[in-house]
């Protein structure tokens, strides 16, 4: 475990070690597939951001069985951070993938319904500003490109931005290529997330099996 990082993702693991491990496994798995190298950055940002919301004292206390309020939930704020970090072409898919990485991806427009998502991030924003912003800036420094976590929190605290995102999801149309990309990166994130905790490495077969194996099976 990296001694300079105090925030944890799991009781015995630092947040930094976990998300960088997930990133490395997902990218290694993707490289093995030898498809779409142009989405490397998309995969990397999704993996690095997927547990951002664990960087609150609410979640840290939850790991110690000392807190169980809604503020411990890391999915929604992590999804918003992913949206903020990604370029426009990947914002919506990244949001969906991260928001549902502990569940199932539903209809995109349903993911932003007011009655299904807690959009009140004020307590989490204040908590990060007061307690963990320095470490989060350190963790994400490579990816912020001159920005900082405070800029994200200020953006998140602006209600007009949240309304705009909801409107975008209601209007956006998706095609089959979007669906396949979403499912593919979602599967890489889940693979990386589980493999990092179990074996801390990607599972890469010793050899590639010929296509005839699949055709004969079918």
Regions from the PLM with identified roles:
Residues 3-11, 15-217:
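Accessory nucleic-acid engagement/destabilization modules that flank
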């Amino acid at each position: 475990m990296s001694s300079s990082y105090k925030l944890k993702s799991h009781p015995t693991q630092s947040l930094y070690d976990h998300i960088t491990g997930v990133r490395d496994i997902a990218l290694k798995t993707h490289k093995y597939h030898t498809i779409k190298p142009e989405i490397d950055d998309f995969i990397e940002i999704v993996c690095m951001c997927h547990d951002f919301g664990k960087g609150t004292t609410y979640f840290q206390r939850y790991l110690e069985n000392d807190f169980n309020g809604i503020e411990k939930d890391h999915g929604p704020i992590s999804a918003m951070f992913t949206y903020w970090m990604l370029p426009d072409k990947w914002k919506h898919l990244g949001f969906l993938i991260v928001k549902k990485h502990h569940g199932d991806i539903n209809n995109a427009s349903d993911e932003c319904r007011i009655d299904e998502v807690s959009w009140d991030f004020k307590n989490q924003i204040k908590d990060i500003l007061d307690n963990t912003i320095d470490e989060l800036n350190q963790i994400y420094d490579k990816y912020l490109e001159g920005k900082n976590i405070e800029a994200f929190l200020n953006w998140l605290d602006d209600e007009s931005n949240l309304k705009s995102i909801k409107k975008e999801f209601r209007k956006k149309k998706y095609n089959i290529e979007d669906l396949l990309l979403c499912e593919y990166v979602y599967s890489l994130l889940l693979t990386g997330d589980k493999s990092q905790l179990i074996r801390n490495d990607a599972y890469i077969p010793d050899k590639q099996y010929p296509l005839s194996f699949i055709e004969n099976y079918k």
